[in-house]
Amino acid sequence: MAPKSACKNALAQLAAELSSASKRDTSSGSTRNSAPELTSLLADLLLSRDDVPLEDLEATTARSHLAKGVFAACKLVPFPVAEVAVRLAVRAIMRRVVVPWQAGENFSMIQRVREAFLRLVDDFDNASKTELNAPFTQCSEYKDLIGGWLTQFGNAVVLTMSEQQLLDDAGSVLNPPEVLAPLVERYPLLIDHVMVQEGMDYLGGKLQSLVAYHALLRCATRPHENGKVPVLAALTMVAEYFDPETKPAYRKVPQKAVAAFDLNLTDEVVSSLVYDQAAAPVVQSEQPVLPQSESLLFTEVVRTRNMLALVQPSATWEGSGAALRNAAGDAKRRQQQAARGAGMAWRCGVDALFSVPMEHVAMNVPAVMQMLHEPPTDIPAEYERALSLYATDTIDAIAKFPDLAASSGTEAVIRSLALRGFTKTNCERYLFAAEAFLEPQAPGTPLHDFYAAVIYASVVGLAAHSLYAYNQHTIFYPEKYSRVLKKTVEAHAYLLDMMGLAISDALISLRAFAPKPPHQAFRTVRDTLAAVVDSVETGAEEFSDLIVSDYVQRLTADFYGGIHENEQWLSERDAAIRQRMEIAAAGRRETDSAGRRPGLGFHELAALVQGLQIGGKEPKAVVEYATAPAGAASAGATFSALFAAAIVRDVMEGAAAIPFEADALARLNKALSWLRDFGLSWNMPDGSHYRRRVIALQAAIHPFVTGKIGVDAVTVKQARALETAMGDLYAACEYSFQALPPPYVGGLRKAAAPSRQHSPLLAQAYTNAAMGDLGVLTKTLAKSAEEISKTVRDMVSRLLSARDLFSRRATASDKNAVTIDAAGPGGTVLGTWEDESVMSGLWKTVNFTEAAIRNTERAVRELEATKRETQDLEESYWQLASGRDGAGNAAQPSESLYQQVAAELVEIADARNAVVVRARSLYRAIAGTGLKRIRTFVKAWRLFLKAERSLAKQVVQQQDLIDALDPSRS
């Protein structure tokens, strides 16, 4: 069928077509045995895959006209066909209704769906009474199902909207499956409905986002023997959930969390978390010289007792120092900060890290980040043991995730990660730091094991949290699952390898997050659908088979059902249907009168088939032939086989010759619908199941016919699906050809199987896919390379400025000021600044460069995420170039295009790998040399400043000087 207009109500269009066809058949005096056009339109209604927007369903006129059109058609089509259509029409419409749950107005949406559905049922009831003089009773159970599901969904929505009540009722743990399970378990027959799938996905995402939140909230508001744990849990929760850009935006900081934070933040806890740099006699070797941004943020929160300062810093607070060009203004701001106590700093180092229970270590973000930025040296033996024990405990806990999920669900895994400090935000922080700054350690050392545990937990945690944002029981999840693993686990494969870990280790731990489609519910729909259509009296077996086989095709292609299992199910059903039809045929032969017209002979039948016009009306002789007693089962099978071997094959050959263009595909789809529906009105048998293959071919071209996907955007996977569907249809035609009696075979020519070598349709589909794949990958490479190049240029420019500063002469005064001259004797004086302004400017360079490194690594990971896709495409095109199909079967040699594409994919992969390696080498070199030297310089200045302050006493003793200059004596 031609693509529908985007502005046209789909229901109104079908209603108009039904009305027109009914008028034509009525005026021509058609009977129930001769309404092929109406039968075809009813098949379109029951088989359509087009979405029905809620607004279309709410359109009163369109809805009413469609109901009238359906029942007007049912008066003219064969009774068994009408019975199937009446029983399934409402479901066929509701199955495709799309509801915008994400809009947030859930209660009004539920009411709109309920009202539109009830009015649809009323319209069908009124039309049934008008056209058939009988009430519409076939929808009572389905009506209860829809109403019950909407009520259940509304109850679940109430829980998510009343968040505090939900958390209070949850007690110790929040268990989303308790809320979501009834939506499937009580209503399995609705599982294939679009609004149900999208509703489960939407609601699951909202509920599951609260699991880690609830666990952290309980930890932050409950007493703990270590007073720092509730404080760190509160900060972890704020960082994860209360950033202004974090969704859902409706969540607010619970008042009890604020009260608990203030209560837990005693003077003792504060002093154990932060210290006053000015009061400290020297800088501890494990303390940061000028703290990282995380340290400054966390310190500000504790100092001001303001939780939200972690994600919403005050406008006057600055954590990154100042540039030399703004030194004067910065000095004034620094004085204001000092007056407010801005000299506080977060306690870092292994002793601070392990001052909380081992299972909460990763909540101490500044301490972990400092470990990743600057590996500690001279670690005491007791802390080496602690590092090793932490690594063992963390990796063992993650290894048990599959067992934990099996007993308590994936939410237990999410809770475990969150309470260990591995929230999604923290995982991203730790991985960024490891990617940019981590210095490799000797394998087997405690520090190496600690880093391995943090990286491993961060990779697994990032993947787990990303996957848990979706409902793993919906049909949308498998694609998201694959995409998330590419962007998380596969993107960090090199980090895992550097730590002596493999991707398989992480994937095993994430096994519980694999897709889990509700196969039993889908099978229930399949079995129930078959039972409904099979309960209709004999005469609509082929029409019913269309409905059932279409669902099975969607079950295997879209719902990830087992192919072998469903093929076996179809085979068993076919046997039962054939047996029923044979019994019915035998009964008719016994009761039919002997005076009926005999079946057509060879010449008449051949002439009848030759006279068929593709897309035209079915000749009345077809019906007469089919209903003749002498031409019963065997004669009907002969005609069906001849139709498939001649007409269907002609259409297939014509399809292979058309261009891969939207208009041509629309015309092909219309011809395929005619093939699919030919003979349905008189139950023409289909021994080769060519109708099923036609449906599969229509499914392959459907996205391009409707415009959901442009023909230029076809992928190699979709091109393969098209080739497979055409090959299956050809096989069905060949089966019919072989089943023909000898007299018919001689008049038919042999036909070649469709192939990309001889079919413009397939060749152009693959060509478009090749150009599209190359274009997308080339654009991705160019964009990432440009982004990386720009960031690296900025980094190098900043470091060159720092190097230029170090090349100049600097003269210090006794007023804590530095005068900087141009390099060389007699250089021009550039200016005089406070020494702290100079150091702050240098540290801003460090902070800027670190941020640039993180941005570069993000771009590198996005680029590296295309690795698997490129490999898959490369393999596909080499197969095409070698003349082999997806199963490895030999075919004819292919055009050189596929070889060229495969070769270019290799070049793209090489270019990508070169960019990744060079970018990582460059920013690691910058982090390991330039930044390290600036840090060392600033650290030396801080040490000297502390020493100077420690000497600022009325009476200075010799030991004071020794202590000040030797930090190890502190």
Curated annotation (Swiss-Prot):
Keyword Mitochondrion on entry: no
Chief localization: virion
Record's subcellular location: Virion tegument; Host cytoplasm; Host nucleus; Host Golgi apparatus, Host trans-Golgi network
GO biological process, one term: virion assembly
Keyword ATP-binding assigned: no
Stored InterPro entries: HSV_ITP (IPR034738)
Region (Interaction with large tegument protein), start-end ranges: 476-970
GO cellular component, one term: viral tegument
Record keywords: Host cytoplasm, Host Golgi apparatus, Host nucleus, Virion, Virion tegument
General function of this protein: Plays an essential role in cytoplasmic secondary envelopment during viral egress. Interacts with the capsid via the large tegument protein/LTP and participates in its transport to the host trans-Golgi network (TGN) where secondary envelopment occurs. Modulates tegumentation and capsid accumulation at the viral assembly complex.
Quaternary structure note: Interacts (via C-terminus) with the large tegument protein/LTP (via N-terminus).
Record family assignment: Belongs to the herpesviridae inner tegument protein family.
Protein's name in the database: Inner tegument protein
Origin species: Psittacid herpesvirus 1 (isolate Amazon parrot/-/97-0001/1997)
Protein's gene: UL37
